[in-house]
């Protein structure tokens, strides 16, 4: 391997899990890729000319999770208020949710609801991901 490759590998070995997740998100945004997408020819057609019958059907995702990844310490109160409005969490549960990140705030919601929640949380100062 080249020196540059070795340096990058050493840096990757030293980062935290949260930093690795942020790195993956940035790579996905920068290069327009999806890290969860399979790479290569993992799909094999059935033998005997049944290729059309075994065609891969791609279903569009209909439910999404809203995940708070980070909240700046000076933005915790506004984010806490939004979390309480979006969920049925009481004050103590909402506070625990925004201090133990990343945390799924909404699960199995529609794309429109997820986008609306993301906007509210980001406007309050949170870093949010939809998956």
Curated annotation (Swiss-Prot):
Domain of life: Eukaryota
Keywords assigned: Chloroplast, Plastid, Ribonucleoprotein, Ribosomal protein
SUPFAM superfamilies: ClpS-like (SSF54736), Ribosomal protein L7/12, oligomerisation (N-terminal) domain (SSF48300)
Swiss-Prot/TrEMBL GO biological process terms: translation
Coiled-coil parts of chain: none
One Gene Ontology cellular component annotation held by this UniProt entry: chloroplast
GO molecular-function terms, A-Z: mRNA binding; structural constituent of ribosome
Bias (Basic and acidic residues) ranges: 110-131
InterPro entries: Ribosomal_bL12, Ribosomal_bL12_C, Ribosomal_bL12_C/ClpS-like, Ribosomal_bL12_oligo, Ribosomal_bL12_oligo_N_sf
Localisation per UniProt entry: Plastid, Chloroplast
Chief place where the protein resides: plastid
Family the entry assigns: Belongs to the bacterial ribosomal protein bL12 family.
HAMAP family, per database record: Ribosomal_bL12
Protein name: Large ribosomal subunit protein bL12c
Organism taxonomic ancestry: Eukaryota, Viridiplantae, Chlorophyta, core chlorophytes, Trebouxiophyceae
